[in-house]
């Protein structure tokens, strides 16, 4: 397959350079049949490539037929408005995986999915369509989603099956059940990530329960994230981790939608943040790797752009020649795994594009890095006997150039450093939580407490000054019923208490109405503003203060609410199961797959080189 893609790329390159239009005479006659001149062209190109003439002729004929189909489709689209979509089917299908499908663009995504399933013999409910690196939305029209004429559509199956399984009803039923489970799993993933992202955006959850909500730099310390970007970043990281979990299990068809969702949310974050951490660069590699493992790399039109972006992000994050990384960590051995994957994918992409020289350069770089990163299994065993995990052993040995003693010291030191960092981060979160609780105890809303502490960089005294200077902050929406001390009118007792403090009775009553009967807040605000209320505060909030009426349905809904909570807990726990405990899990790899693929593609390139030398 890879060799055929190389041949197609080289022949396409030759045709472009020689300005040959295969869909015109003398290569195509008036009946759109192949012309005699095509055989001469195949002979000419096979001599240039030192390839079998029949194979070259066959590929050129395929290119000619595709060109005619595309031209016919273009004419048809101009006259009728019926667009052509190039459909790439799953690898398991033995028939030609690139197929053309005609459709109007005003139909919905669901109708297109149904049409693809019917045309190519797939089960509609168990496939997903990816167009322009986005999942096709079933409820929107193709036009609304930017689907255009001649677009590429990749079909992903939610099940792993073989042809003989389709002949057996029992096996097919099992596959359908498996697909249903995977679809439910995807939906739970989305729900769980939304819950975690919401918690992260609120930044008020218990630090004991939220170690998974942090994003850290190369030292392991948490990075301060603007509230406006926090939710998007958490969703991006969550989808990325879930996608990586599927990648580890080699479930590429399910991994890809998660990775594409992660890419979408990362794009909502500022450039400065993405340059601070390597997450975004790693995601680009994972997306290209996923397309490659699905044997659909040609569907990813911007594979080169993604790989270049990853390389640029690594440079911004790690510094020129990894200098910044070495300065921070003392080594860059573990991160070299990422560069091995980068060079390998660049080599594969160049080979598929017909660029043998560039392909060999990148593949050779990957091979050299593999030799450098290869780990003697006996050294891993030595570290396992010392009580370290296999993952710690691999990472430690790569960080210490394979020296077992140095690796043991490195792992121990790293454990101690991370334990200290976690202790400091935990204490910082604990203080923040205490400050929020303190402000809530004074009558301020959770939302107001969060925002003012963020504005005051966590300083409680400064936060109190801000709140007293801007009492309208207390009016920020808060859905926590614990802080909802609403009453229609203040009690005479509370009015008298404020009058006793020296405030005017009418002003005292107005302040108590504004602050929902909270004497402490009313007194603080009046004292801070010279005995009067700030003009920006609403003085007639009765409509918003009336307590919600209690109905019999409220108590009846308790069971339903409990069920929802259980479902949320299940969704969150499923996400947490795939969040790796080790913060450098993404740097850990046995490199077994990479070793095989490097050898495979180098053999293709070296065979081409040896064939060229013989001639």
UniProtKB/Swiss-Prot annotation:
A motif (Nuclear localization signal) lies at residues 414-431. Residues 532-586 are annotated as: Disordered. Residues 427-474 are annotated as: NEDD8-binding 1. Residues 374-413, 424-470, 489-529 form the UBA domain. Residues 550-598 are annotated as: NEDD8-binding 2. It comes from the Eukaryota. It is found in: Nucleus. Residues 563-586 have a biased composition (Acidic residues). GO terms for biological process: positive regulation of proteasomal ubiquitin-dependent protein catabolic process; proteasomal protein catabolic process; protein ubiquitination; regulation of ubiquitin-dependent protein catabolic process; response to tumor necrosis factor; response to type II interferon; ubiquitin-dependent protein catabolic process. The keyword Endoplasmic reticulum does not apply. GO terms for cellular component: cytosol; Lewy body; nucleolus; nucleoplasm. CDD domains: UBA1_NUB1_like, UBA2_NUB1, Ubl_NUB1. Changing residue 448 to V: No effect on NEDD8-binding. SMART domains: UBA (SM00165). Directly interacts with NEDD8 and PSMD4/S5a, a member of the regulatory subunit of the 26S proteasome. Isoform 1 binds to NEDD8 more efficiently than isoform 2. Interacts with AIPL1. The interaction with UBD via UBA domains facilitates the linking of UBD-conjugated target protein to the proteasome complex and accelerates UBD degradation and that of its conjugates. Specific down-regulator of the NEDD8 conjugation system. Recruits NEDD8, UBD, and their conjugates to the proteasome for degradation. Isoform 1 promotes the degradation of NEDD8 more efficiently than isoform 2. This is NEDD8 ultimate buster 1. The gene is NUB1.
């Amino acid at each position: 397959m890879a060799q055929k893609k190389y041949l197609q790329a080289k022949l396409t390159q030759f045709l472009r350079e020689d300005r040959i239009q295969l869909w015109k005479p003398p290569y195509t006659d008036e009946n759109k049949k192949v012309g005699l001149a095509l055989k001469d062209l195949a002979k000419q190109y096979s001599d240039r490539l030192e390839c079998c003439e029949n194979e070259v002729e066959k590929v050129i004929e395929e290119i000619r037929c595709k060109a005619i189909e595309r031209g016919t489709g273009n004419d048809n689209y101009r006259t009728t408005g019926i667009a052509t979509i190039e459909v790439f089917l799953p690898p398991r299908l033995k028939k030609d995986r690139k197929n053309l499908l005609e459709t109007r663009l005003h139909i919905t995504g669901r109708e297109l999915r149904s049409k693809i399933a019917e045309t190519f013999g797939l089960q509609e409910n168990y496939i997903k369509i990816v167009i322009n690196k986005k999942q096709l939305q079933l409820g929107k029209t193709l036009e609304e989603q930017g689907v255009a004429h001649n677009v590429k559509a990749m079909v992903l199956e939610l099940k792993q099956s073989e042809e003989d399984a389709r002949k057996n009803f029992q096996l097919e039923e099992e596959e359908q059940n498996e697909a249903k489970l995977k679809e439910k799993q995807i939906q739970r993933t989305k729900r769980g990530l939304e819950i975690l992202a919401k918690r992260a955006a609120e930044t008020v959850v218990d630090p004991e329960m939220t170690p998974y909500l942090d994003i850290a730099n190369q030292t392991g310390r948490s990075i301060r994230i603007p509230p406006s970007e926090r939710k998007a970043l958490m969703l991006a990281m969550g989808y990325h981790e879930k996608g990586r979990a599927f990648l580890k299990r080699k479930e590429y068809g399910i991994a890809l939608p998660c990775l594409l969702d992660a890419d979408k949310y990362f794009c909502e974050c500022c450039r400065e943040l993405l340059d601070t951490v390597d997450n975004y660069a790693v995601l680009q590699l994972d997306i290209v790797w996923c397309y490659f493992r699905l044997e659909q790399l040609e569907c990813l039109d911007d594979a080169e752009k993604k790989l270049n972006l990853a390389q640029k992000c690594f440079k911004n994050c790690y510094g020129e020649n990894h200098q910044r990384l070495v300065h921070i960590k003392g080594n860059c051995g573990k991160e070299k795994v990422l560069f091995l994957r980068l060079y390998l994918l660049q080599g594969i992409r160049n080979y598929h594009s017909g660029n043998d020289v560039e392909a060999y350069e990148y593949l050779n770089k990957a091979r050299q890095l593999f030799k450098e990163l290869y780990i003697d299994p006996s050294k891993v065993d030595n570290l396992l006997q010392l009580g370290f995990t296999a993952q710690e052993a691999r990472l430690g040995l790569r960080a210490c150039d394979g020296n077992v003693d140095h690796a043991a010291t490195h792992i121990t030191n790293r454990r101690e450093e991370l334990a200290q960092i976690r202790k400091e981060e935990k204490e910082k979160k604990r203080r923040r939580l205490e400050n929020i609780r303190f402000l809530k105890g004074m009558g301020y809303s959770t939302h107001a407490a969060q925002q003012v502490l963020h504005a005051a960089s966590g300083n409680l005294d400064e936060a109190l000054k801000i709140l007293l200077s801007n009492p309208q902050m207390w009016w920020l929406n808060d859905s926590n019923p614990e802080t909802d001390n609403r009453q229609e009118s203040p009690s005479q007792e509370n009015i008298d208490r404020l009058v006793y403090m020296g405030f005017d009775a009418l002003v005292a009553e107005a302040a108590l109405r504004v602050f929902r009967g909270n004497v402490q807040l009313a007194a603080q605000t009046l004292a801070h503003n010279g005995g009067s209320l700030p003009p920006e505060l609403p003085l007639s909030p009765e409509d918003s203060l009336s307590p919600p009426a209690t109905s019999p349905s409220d108590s009846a809904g308790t069971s339903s609410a409990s069920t929802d909570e259980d479902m949320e807990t299940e969704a969150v726990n499923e996400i947490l199961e795939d969040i790796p405990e080790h913060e450098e899990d993404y740097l850990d790899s046995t490199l077994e797959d990479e070793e095989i693929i490097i050898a495979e593609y180098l053999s293709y390139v070296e065979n081409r080189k040896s064939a060229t030398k013989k001639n």
